[in-house]
Amino acid sequence: MKIGFIGTGNMGTILIESFIESKAADPSNMTITNRTIEKALHIKNRYNSINVTESLEKLVSENEMIFICVKPLDIYPLLARALPYLRKDHILISITSPVQTEQLEQYVPCQVARVIPSITNRALAGVSLVTFGTSCGESAKAKINELMQHISHPLQIESDITRVASDIVSCGPAFMSYLIQRFIDAAVSETSVSKQDAILMCKEMLVGMGKLLETELYTLPALQEKVCVKGGVTGEGIKALESGVQDMFHRVFQNTHMKYEEDISAVKKQFHV
């Protein structure tokens, strides 16, 4: 199957690299383009057989599955340019959360899906969030799932939980990274540990914790209970976390949903739906 990618920004590049390195797709069967073509050529420097084009017509016409990896408000004008070349048998996949499959289906003649990836997919791990349009046939669904299974655990979701699911899967690594950095900074500030050692210890702790959860020996609450011995130092640390966290994550979700609604409103004005 030939796959085209429109947009080689952060997530577009992650998908391209992950598909190649997982052997989900051969680079010779992939065509990429970008508004700044030098970014696409930079990828070709690493994967020589990948195809690069500046022609949207060529990319759309010569590929069966097309990933749109551009910003939400860039999708509508992009589709206006691609529309003459889209066929009924094309599989069009958007990776951005504010654009709904129903909006795409009203505008294009082909099969439509939304796949929201995560930076964790770069390690061929984590979840990808999949929403199929009503136009998406069983064969297309199978192709999308098979492709995403090479780099992730594809989880089919309905539109009403898109934002919270994206917050956990896609934004989550950034949220956790921020918290770990503050954890490291506090350790360095409060004790004599070096930043280099604190980073190493935290990194290995996170890797080990991930592997431990993967074994399913412990749930998160069970893991906490195993470490948090009654009367021990961990319990004192948990007390500090409880007083500090409070409604913090509630506010995180409130903020992301507020921005999401703004993005949805802007997209609706473009699609008139």
Swiss-Prot record:
One of the GO BP terms on file: L-proline biosynthetic process
SUPFAM superfamilies given in the database record: 6-phosphogluconate dehydrogenase C-terminal domain-like (SSF48179), NAD(P)-binding Rossmann-fold domains (SSF51735)
InterPro entries: 6-PGluconate_DH-like_C_sf (IPR008927), NAD(P)-bd_dom_sf (IPR036291), P5C_Rdtase_cat_N (IPR028939), P5CR-like_CS (IPR053790), P5CR_dimer (IPR029036), Pyrroline-COOH_reductase (IPR000304)
GO molecular function per UniProt: pyrroline-5-carboxylate reductase activity
Domain of life, per lineage: Bacteria
Gene3D superfamilies: NAD(P)-binding Rossmann-like Domain, ProC C-terminal domain-like
Pfam families per UniProt: F420_oxidored, P5CR_dimer
Family: Belongs to the pyrroline-5-carboxylate reductase family.
Task of the protein: Dispensable for transformability. Not known if it can act as a pyrroline-5-carboxylate reductase.
NCBIfam families per UniProt: PRK07680.1
Protein name: ComE operon protein 4
Organism: Bacillus subtilis (strain 168)
Gene (name only): comER
